[in-house]
Amino acid sequence: MAHHLLLAYSTTDGHTRHICERLQFVMTALGQRVTLVPIEQADALNLNQFERIVIGASIRYGHHQPQVAQFIARHQAVLQSRPSAFFSVNIVARKSDKNRPDNNPYLLKFLRQISWQPQLLGVFAGKLNYPS
């Protein structure tokens, strides 16, 4: 039986959602059952039904959206009790000295603000939208 994976995301301009949709496509192709939801809707789910949980969050003006840390705080016990991952999407990750979990300032700052310790961390370069 396939593991059931939750992909919860917080996005500002849709790029993090796009990354999660791609992850969903790949994981489904590998035989995984995947539920993809905005983090605002994840509270309505019974998180105990998921064997694995991944949270993706974008940076806007130097910060992840507050609902990300709030969701993590509310569900800390469940997140800590199973394989879990977190990734940050931010524009500075395009630079080689800021494109890894151990050197991305936004991810490192966020991890200091929460007590959850995901087993897997990731950083993706964000999309910069220029006004037309």
Question: Predicted regions: what is each one?
Answer:
Residues 2-4, 18, 26-30, 35, ...:
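FMN-binding flavodoxin-like domain, especially the glycine-rich phosphate-binding loop
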Residues 38:
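Short loop/edge segments at beta-strand edges and connector loops
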Residues 11-18:
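Glycine-rich NAD(P) Rossmann-fold beta1-alpha1 loop
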